[in-house]
Structures are given as C-alpha cells and as structure tokens.
C-alpha cells in the first residue's frame, strides 16, 4: 500500500546555470516557465504565476506594476507587463552581482554566432550576448554588449512590428549608429499588402495591374531597449 509519505524515487536535474543556458540559447518557453515556478513555494505554485520572481525584483528595485508585472515565466502572457527600463535595471543588477555575473553572461548566446541570435546581423566592431524574444507584433533583444573594452547592457523592444525582418534590421541600424561610424544599413522593403478574399478580391483583380503593383502596406514600430 502506497501512502503519501512513501518516497518512490529521486530525480536530480541539471545544474541551474546549465538550465539557464539551455533556456536562453534555445529560447525555451517550457524551461523558462519551470525555472520561474521553481522559486515558488508549494502553495504559491497553485496560483500559476511567478510570484517570488515578481515580488523579488519589484521590491529590490522599486519597480511599479506598470514597469514590471510578469504573469508567467516565458513572457507570452498578453496580461504581463515589462518595460525596457525595468529590464535594463535588472540586467545592470545581475552584472554587479559577482556570484551571478559570469554564469548569467555565459548563458546568453553570442549574436551572429550561436543560439536563436546566430542569424542576427551586428556591426563587426561589437560583440553582443543577447536573448531574443518574440510574439505576434513584438520582437525584442536584451543582454550585454562589448565595444572597445567597455561593457553595456542593452534592451530593444519593437512593439507593433508587422515585419520581423524590419524589426531586426532596425536593431542592427541602432547598433551601427551608436557604436560605429559606418553608414546605416538599409531597411528591408515593406511587406506587400495581401488582397482580401471573395467578391471584393475578384473586383479588385480586374483593376489596373500597375496600381496594384505599387500598393504596399505601412509597417509601424516602436523601438526601445528591451
């Protein structure tokens, strides 16, 4: 007979720094959720929210609910709140903590080389270690950047980003403008407008092909350091 006090077995996970590296290199939402909820007590886990993580940073840095109020560990909840300023403060605090500085930096993939940022184009004068993040209409990068033997924390969030390629290119232009004397690289062409389906589409197709060819959608963005 098995009772609630019987131990059936033990499982030892990988070290926390290894789990963090897997999370950041693969951009694993499942790992991010697990790490956030692992900090909660048994009772707190019933809420389904990252209670301890949220309380710690809000109290430690004096962040308001509009600046920092995550509703999950992965950041996918549309009800969560995270400002670029709050994330910048957190990155700076982690950098100053000698016990967390090296393992956290090691958990971030190098831009243009590895992880989810291996295809990200950055200026050759810069070495960047970044975590990428995206959901519909939003793309961001956050981490640390080395330029001329000086380290910087950087956060970039593009809200209302219809075109992901444009959001990435804008981030590249930002780094180019801040840290080099090179001319800014061009932005990709705007995404073409998709014609509506049905009767309206049939009527439109009878019109001038030249006018249709010139039509393009307007993409908007709001960038800031993430």
Locations of the language-model features?
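A small/polar active-site loop signature that marks catalytic segments
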Residues: 1-98, 102-103
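C-terminal soluble interaction/assembly domains
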Residues: 56, 66-209, 213, 218-226
């Amino acid at each position: 007979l098995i009772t609630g006090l019987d131990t059936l077995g033990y499982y030892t996970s990988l070290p926390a720094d290894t789990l963090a590296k897997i999370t950041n290199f693969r951009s694993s939402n499942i790992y991010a959720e697990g790490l956030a909820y692992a900090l909660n007590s048994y009772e707190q886990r019933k809420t389904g929210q990252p209670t301890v993580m949220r309380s710690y940073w809000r109290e430690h840095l004096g962040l308001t609910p509009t600046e920092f109020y995550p509703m999950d560990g992965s950041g996918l909840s549309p009800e969560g709140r995270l400002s670029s300023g709050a994330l910048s403060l957190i990155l700076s605090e982690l950098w100053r903590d000698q016990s967390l500085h090296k393992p956290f930096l090691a958990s971030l993939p190098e831009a243009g080389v590895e992880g989810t940022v291996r295809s990200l184009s950055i200026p050759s004068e810069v070495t960047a270690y970044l975590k990428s993040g995206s959901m519909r209409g939003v793309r961001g990068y956050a981490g640390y950047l080395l330029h001329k033997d000086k380290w910087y924390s950087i956060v970039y969030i593009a809200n209302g980003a219809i075109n992901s390629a444009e959001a990435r290119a804008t981030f590249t232009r930002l780094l180019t403008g801040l840290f080099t004397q090179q001319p800014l690289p061009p932005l990709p062409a705007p995404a073409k407008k998709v014609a509506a389906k049905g009767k309206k589409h049939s009527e439109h197709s009878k019109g001038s092909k030249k006018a249709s060819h010139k039509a393009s959608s307007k993409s908007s963005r709001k960038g800031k350091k993430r």
